[in-house]
Design a protein with these regions (language model features):
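FAD-site-proximal beta/loop scaffold in flavoenzymes
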Residues: 74-93, 182-255
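N-terminal Rossmann-like dinucleotide/flavin-binding domain of flavoprotein oxidoreductases
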Residues: 1-54, 132-155, 284-289, 374
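Conserved N-terminal Rossmann-fold NAD(P)-binding element of oxidoreductases
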Residues: 59, 99-100
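Core beta-strand elements of the Rossmann-like FAD/NAD(P) dinucleotide-binding domain
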Residues: 47-56, 177-187, 224
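Short loop/edge segments at beta-strand edges and connector loops
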Residues: 30-32, 37, 61, 81-83, ...
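Flexible, glycine-rich terminal cap/loop adjacent to redox cofactors
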Residues: 272-377
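Rossmann-like dinucleotide-binding cores of NAD(P)H-dependent redox enzymes
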Residues: 8-14, 18, 86-87, 93-97, ...
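Residue-level detector of alpha-helix initiation sites
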Residues: 65, 102-104, 135, 195, ...
Length: 377
């Protein structure tokens, strides 16, 4: 029932986005597009072809799931990606092994656990969530283990096949001690791998590509061909929705004659696990590697009045302060519903706002946001 309700809400959101575009004067065409030239695209839908022309072309066709070469996606063999999960067919499995302890893998671990499945995460590195601050990653690992989610680090899959009983046999190898283990499961979910989805006819543009088969662009999102731009997963880099939105605005500005180079400073991330993680700026490992003069400031939701009243008492905020400049280098949250708290950190890191200014903000009381001030005091 809850999934059905979520589907209804998402459909309303899509309708809202469509209405916003139409109010802005954007015409939407549904179908398969083919690039004819730098200034012409043809769209085929229901046997009819529509020719569209313009002075500029933006390639923003995203990416699709992929997998390591030795482990091809194959739904008939139980080796699946997020697309198969979101179709709904695999949500009722009793057991799942997830390859990758990245944001995608950890979010799906939370989903499957809430659906009642036994969950095992296999992570090639020595810890899950390598893009996060180490304190966040360790916190999430401990919370996962409390929930019964098994986390195996330094591990990868060497073999995967159905046995005679219809169970999927996954052979995982631990690179730390060179041992192997057989896991019996209903599905192997492969995460963190993707290939760019390229439109038909893109080769006609004779673009310059990088070594990962992504379109090369400059800081204005311009490709090697005049009037042709590219954004999002087709250019690689930071493959997140907020990065693609920023790149889209940069490309639009370039087309409109208001060129401003893209800046990823203050780019944040959110991991919708249980509990959640969010962050912006440098991790402590980054600050240490750069030999910066920094100080760690920390506060806990168990001491925040609003968090306690909501029952959100686990978790913390960790803030890295530049001792010399007295600005915020990074801000990292772990806890319940903390995805809504990261915006102040984004503003502080993006604009190099002094610590004193952030600390003295007259925030509403009682709110969870006050934990930022509590950490900086």
């Amino acid at each position: 029932e809850s999934l059905k309700t979520l589907g209804i809400r998402m459909q309303k959101a899509k309708e809202g986005w469509k209405s916003s575009l139409e109010r802005a004067g954007v015409k939407i065409y549904y179908g398969e597009a083919e690039i004819i030239s730098e200034q012409e695209v043809r769209v085929v839908a229901d046997g009819e072809t529509t020719a569209l022309t313009g002075e500029s072309l933006v390639v923003a066709t995203g990416s699709e799931p992929s997998s390591p070469m030795a482990l091809q996606l194959d739904e008939s063999r139980g080796i699946i990606s997020y697309k198969e999960v979101l179709s709904g067919k695999w949500l009722n499995v009793k057991d799942v092994v997830i390859l990758g302890g990245n944001i995608e893998g950890c979010e799906f671990a939370t989903l499957f656990k809430k659906m009642g499945a036994a969950v095992t995460i296999l992570e090639l590195g020595d810890g899950i969530m390598p893009m996060c601050d180490p304190d966040q990653a360790q916190f999430l690992k401990e919370e996962f283990e409390k929930q019964g989610i098994e986390v195996k680090t330094n591990s990868t899959v060497t073999q995967c096949q159905y046995n005679e009983e219809g169970k999927l046999e996954v052979i995982c190898k631990n690179k730390a001690d060179d041992t192997s283990q057989k896991l019996l499961t209903d599905a192997l979910l492969v995460t963190g791998e993707s290939n760019p989805v390229l439109p038909r006819g893109v080769e006609k543009l004779e673009l310059v590509w990088d070594e990962n088969n992504r379109i090369k662009v400059n800081e204005y999102m311009e490709t090697s061909q005049k009037g042709v731009y590219a954004i999002g997963d087709v250019i690689g880099g930071i493959t997140s929705a907020n990065a693609a939105i920023l790149e889209g605005k940069t490309a639009a500005g370039s087309i409109a004659g208001e060129k401003t180079p893209v800046s990823y400073k203050g780019m944040s991330y959110v991991c919708f696990t249980d509990p959640q993680l969010s962050g912006v700026g440098l991790r402590e490992t980054d600050a240490r590697e750069r030999q910066l003069n920094y100080r760690v400031k920390k506060a806990y939701f168990s001491e925040n009045m609003r968090a306690l009243s909501l029952g959100y008492e686990k978790g913390f905020v960790k803030i890295l302060v530049d001792v010399d400049k007295q600005t915020i280098l990074g801000m990292h949250f772990a806890g319940d519903n903390i995805s809504e708290l990261i915006s102040i950190g984004v503003l502080a890191c993006h604009r190099d706002i002094p610590v004193k200014v952030v600390r003295d903000l007259p925030l509403a009381h009682p709110t969870m946001t006050e934990i930022i001030k509590e950490a900086l005091c």
